[in-house]
């Protein structure tokens, strides 16, 4: 594998051809001698030399040949075929969006001035951006977060525009008990608490990831609560500073959402956000490694996990409450099919297909956001389904 990788690296440099061909070939051949013992056969240097020289001679004719879709779009063949079948009119656009450079998108904290205040701080710092959605700002150029005014004090957080739809769809209200079932790294939890004076239970099965939730909530200036705390919970206030009487803050738990018996106190939740584990097929531009370590068979495994989590969490929702099912996937086996099967089995469940994100002109009726990168839209791929529980 190391020798093949070295050969591919040499060919990639010959295609780019920013340096003289003899230099590229010579340095690649020399690199063979730097490989670990046993990684290359005795004639490897000569083999690399010969193949690169031939590639350099025949490069024009080789590159003129039409590439298979797998090579042209740099996606596994099964992935290309699947997307092409699902969206025959948009498949190339979807694949190219997944290969685009992901922008740095920010979410303005509504409790610290919101989108307009964040925009003013960016303008003052000479940072180019465009407003998107109710709380979003997309930077013209990505920057380290320590150079973004307002990040350290929690007035802005990094979050994709598509991911910001979760809290807006769930629509938290003052005084409610809300469960964020798979909460790490905590962006959606913080957004819920920025929107309303509510009490959120934020869970993650991994203690290290639960710690990340805590860190992000502290930066966003959200009170951290505990189910057995001796400290006073955060007091919610109006814009004028008057107390509302509601509890405002987050309980962060390292717990398994699929095993409620181990952590649930028996009190039903008004709203539940289930951002379920998935293939991550909608966020490839941020995690390109997903393309090559994800296997076709993984989708069925994720679907089973998603269905199990829905079954386990539904009893925790009060009658009249709402559950938002979300994944960062573009495959219907993890989205529409999971929800349809669950709703057909659950007599007290209604899928609210008509719900839209406020201000989103062309929100997809089925809730499947596809990756897009253009003037009007700049977001990853997500699936959202809002489920209501009959009284």
Locate the predicted segments by residue.
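S-adenosylmethionine
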Residues: 1-391
């Amino acid at each position: 594998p190391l020798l093949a990788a070295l050969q591919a690296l040499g060919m990639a440099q010959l295609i780019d051809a920013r340096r003289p061909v003899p230099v590229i070939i010579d340095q690649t051949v020399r690199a063979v001698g730097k490989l670990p013992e046993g990684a290359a056969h005795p004639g490897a240097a000569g083999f690399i030399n010969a193949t690169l020289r031939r590639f350099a001679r025949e490069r024009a004719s080789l590159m003129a040949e039409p590439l298979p879709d797998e090579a042209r779009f740099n996606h596994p063949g099964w992935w290309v075929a699947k997307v092409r079948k699902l969206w025959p009119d948009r498949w190339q656009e979807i694949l190219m969006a997944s290969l685009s450079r992901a922008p740095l998108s920010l979410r303005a904290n509504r409790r610290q001035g919101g989108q307009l205040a964040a925009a003013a701080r960016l303008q003052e710092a000479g940072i180019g951006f465009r407003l998107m959605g109710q709380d979003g700002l997309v930077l013209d150029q990505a920057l380290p977060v320590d150079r973004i005014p307002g990040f350290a004090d929690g007035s802005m957080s990094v979050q994709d525009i598509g991911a910001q739809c979760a809290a807006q769809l769930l629509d938290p209200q003052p005084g409610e008990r809300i469960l964020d079932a798979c909460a790490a790294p905590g962006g959606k939890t913080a957004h819920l608490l920025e929107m309303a004076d509510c009490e959120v239970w934020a869970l993650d099965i991994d203690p290290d990831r639960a710690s990340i939730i805590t860190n992000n909530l502290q930066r966003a200036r959200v009170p951290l609560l505990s189910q057995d705390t001796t400290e006073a919970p955060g007091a919610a206030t109006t814009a004028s500073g008057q107390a509302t009487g509601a509890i405002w803050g987050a309980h962060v738990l390292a717990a398994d959402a699929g095993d409620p018996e181990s952590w649930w106190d028996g009190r039903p939740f008004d709203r539940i956000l289930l951002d379920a584990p998935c293939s991550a097929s909608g966020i490839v531009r941020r995690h390109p490694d997903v393309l090559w370590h994800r296997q076709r068979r993984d989708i069925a495994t994720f679907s089973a996990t998603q269905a199990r989590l829905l079954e386990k969490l539904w009893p925790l929702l009060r009658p009249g409450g709402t559950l938002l099912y979300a994944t960062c996937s573009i495959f219907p086996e993890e989205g529409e099919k999971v929800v349809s099967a669950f709703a057909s089995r659950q007599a007290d469940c209604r899928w609210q297909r008509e719900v839209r994100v406020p201000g989103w002109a062309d929100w997809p009726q089925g809730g499947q956001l596809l990756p897009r990168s253009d003037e009007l839209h700049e977001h990853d791929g997500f699936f959202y389904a809002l489920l209501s529980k009959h009284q």
